[in-house]
């Protein structure tokens, strides 16, 4: 069997690798190695798509010689993506392309001038409609009541889960939490290797802290996942929940609470919108959400026109009405 970076022996495409590269010297492999597993799969697929597009299917991400790419290649990729993909998807794939070329430059495989021109392609501009929504306070109450009306242990577990989601965590981050990641003194949760492999601290407000404490009184303080599955017999199963289990729980509680359809990620939108509504600055909110760029955080703001009106209303204009209210005479 050939190595991951070894090209086919009969691959004569001019952009194909002529000889195998060690993974430590392969720009695509170096780039992918720095990503979280989920992002790695997504970006590997993007790079495979780019390689196949450039070589009519002759190469994939590991058999393409990325150091041979020039502006004419990257410009052609951008043009093809504009026709084939939604702008968000196309820009994500172009970002992967730029990052691989950057690794090729760092590895001294591409001339700096050739690199500068190859990556000098603009992102695809678009004004996307807002996806998702923020949950209202009444909807959150309905979800919690649906959990509390469940006499089984799943009710307490699910309230704890929703409380953690309301602190802005992604569902993958929720199921990855361990008991040792929770600090009851501060209400802090250590989110390890979140998106982009970044660690951060999240914090639970008082009500959420009480909900988690009630679950922990049942769970106990032994090491392991913070949230456990509960089987049909009502017994705790000492293993980690899955992402899909979180989705199932939310769908179930949403139906029980007569809440309009929502996604797990809508809790992050709610968290960010509520914090901004409370007057928190966007830098602090972006850190709590685990965003490296505050511009990403701003995209989660679902407050709409009312928030803009209220923000302007807080501005002070140093004007006082004239004592003589009559219109000035000509």
Predicted regions and their residues:
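Conserved catalytic core of the tyrosine transesterase superfamily
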Residues: 1-330
């Amino acid at each position: 069997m050939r190595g991951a970076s070894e090209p086919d022996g009969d691959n004569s495409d001019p952009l194909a690798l002529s000889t195998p590269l060690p993974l430590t010297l392969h720009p695509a492999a170096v780039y992918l190695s720095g990503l979280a597993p989920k992002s790695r799969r997504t970006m590997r697929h993007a790079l495979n798509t780019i390689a196949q597009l450039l070589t009519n299917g002759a190469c994939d991400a590991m058999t393409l010689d990325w150091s041979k790419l020039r502006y004419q290649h990257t410009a052609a990729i951008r043009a093809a993506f504009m026709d084939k993909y939604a702008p968000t998807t196309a820009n994500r794939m172009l970002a992967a392309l730029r990052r691989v070329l950057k690794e090729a430059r760092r590895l001294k495989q591409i001339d700096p001038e050739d690199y500068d021109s190859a990556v000098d392609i603009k992102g695809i501009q678009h004004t996307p409609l807002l996806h998702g929504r923020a949950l209202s306070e009444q909807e959150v109450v309905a979800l919690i009541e649906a959990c509390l009306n469940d006499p089984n242990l799943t009710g307490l577990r699910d309230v704890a889960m929703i409380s953690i989601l309301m602190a802005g965590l992604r569902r993958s981050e929720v199921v990855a939490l361990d008991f040792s990641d929770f600090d009851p003194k501060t209400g802090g949760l250590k989110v390890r290797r979140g998106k982009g492999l970044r660690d951060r601290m999240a914090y639970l407000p008082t009500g959420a802290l009480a909900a988690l404490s009630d679950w922990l009184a049942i769970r106990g303080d032994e090491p392991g996942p913070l949230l456990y599955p509960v089987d049909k017999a009502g017994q705790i199963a000492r293993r980690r929940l899955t992402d899909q289990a979180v989705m199932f729980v939310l769908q179930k509680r949403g139906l029980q609470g007569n809440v309009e359809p929502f996604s797990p990620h809508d809790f992050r939108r709610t968290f960010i919108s509520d914090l901004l509504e409370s007057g928190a600055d966007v830098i602090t909110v972006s850190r709590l959400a685990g965003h490296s760029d505050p511009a990403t955080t701003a995209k989660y703001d679902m407050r709409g026109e009312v928030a803009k009106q209220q923000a302007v209303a807080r501005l002070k204009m140093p004007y006082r009405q004239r004592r003589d209210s009559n219109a000035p005479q000509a």
